[in-house]
Amino acid sequence: MNYYIIGIGAAIIIITALLYWLYSYIFPEKSKVSSKNYLFNTGIRSIPLDELKNPTSKTYSIELWLYINTLPKTETAIFSYSPSQSVSLIIDPHNILTFKNTQRKEQSMKITNIPLRRWVYIVINVKYNLVEMYMDGKLVDSGKISSRYINSISYEDSITFGSIDAYIAGMNRNTKLLDLETIRKQYYKDKNDLRH
């Protein structure tokens, strides 16, 4: 009788652990970087990395909704990791959105022709030195960026926002990569929410 109870107890513990692992794999942890719309041209804001879950992880994804009113006159960061300046998301006067390691400018991923005056859903997946960029649920660029720079993020860093005529909403830093199906589902779900 006692072996039977011990066996059932062990089975319940194992099943609970498996369900937790499966849940955490399907639904990665998110760190809300912004829970409201920010108007960038009111100044620079920063968020300390110690407020994020697993901030120095070499595998992560960043998702955000971006609304650009007008293009800047010079290359301007939407966000960057400071003070290391290891990675930045930058918009330039030629309407090119670039995710790059700031130390080696030739290593970058780009999205061209960002629509102005409408919400655009951007996802950046980073796995060591492999980077993928998505816009509105579609893969637009992928490649490698030197892991020496892109993964040199430290707890002393913060995410610093630039000063441009734009809004950002729902920025999340996920502890895992987002797959294409998840990106598309989130795009269509949030797209409907932003219309209201």
Question: Where are the model-predicted features located?
Answer:
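Extracellular glycan-associated modules
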Residues: M1-H196
